[in-house]
């Protein structure tokens, strides 16, 4: 929820803090550079850009955070490879639309994509649309926020 972001499905399901990338990305990226990484794949959390997934305006704090991550990668000569959706549909979209069961999600997704493409177009060359989209069949809620009655 930091940086004025919304709630993700994973936030509610996690039982621990993990690596706390939000506060330690500079050290993490420096370690990656020390190990010789030339590319760093990471995800942009949709709800950090549009807290509810369907907000009128993007969250500038979230946009600035990812810009700082991208700039840190570039500082060390690493190519950022950005995943647009990595099992992190905003929870408000699940409640309002039923996630991807509703075609209304397409407009929300396209708005999110346009926002990040326009913001980072001079800094990011490689984009992945969905992480492991096939996982929707095995884990519909975790992969896409889809609940079945």
Question: What is the role of each PLM region?
Answer:
Residues 1-9, 33-34, 52-54, 63-149:
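Active-site region of glycoside hydrolase catalytic domains
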Residues 1-30:
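Aromatic- and Gly/Pro-rich amphipathic surface segment
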Residues 39-46, 50-51, 59-69:
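General structural concept
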Residues 19, 57-60:
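Residue-level marker of alpha-helix boundaries and capping positions
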Residues 20, 24-45, 79:
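Catalytic domains of carbohydrate-active enzymes, especially glycoside hydrolases
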Residues 22, 53-56:
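Short, flexible active-site loop motifs that bind/organize anionic cofactors or intermediates
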Residues 14, 39, 43, 47, ...:
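Generic serine detector
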């Amino acid at each position: 929820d930091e940086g004025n972001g919304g709630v993700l499905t994973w936030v509610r399901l996690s039982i621990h803090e993990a690596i706390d990338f939000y506060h330690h990305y500079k050290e993490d990226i420096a370690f990656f550079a020390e190990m010789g990484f030339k590319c760093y794949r990471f995800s942009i959390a949709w709800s950090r850009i549009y807290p509810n997934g369907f907000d009128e305006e993007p969250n500038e704090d979230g946009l600035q955070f990812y810009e700082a991550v991208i700039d840190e990668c570039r500082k060390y000569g690493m190519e950022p490879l950005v995943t647009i959706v990595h099992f992190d549909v905003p929870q408000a979209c699940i409640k309002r639309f039923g996630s991807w069961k509703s075609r209304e999600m397409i407009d929300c997704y396209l708005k999110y994509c346009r926002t990040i493409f326009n913001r980072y177009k001079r800094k990011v060359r490689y984009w992945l649309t969905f992480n492991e989209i096939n996982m929707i069949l095995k884990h519909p809620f975790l992969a896409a926020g889809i609940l079945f009655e």
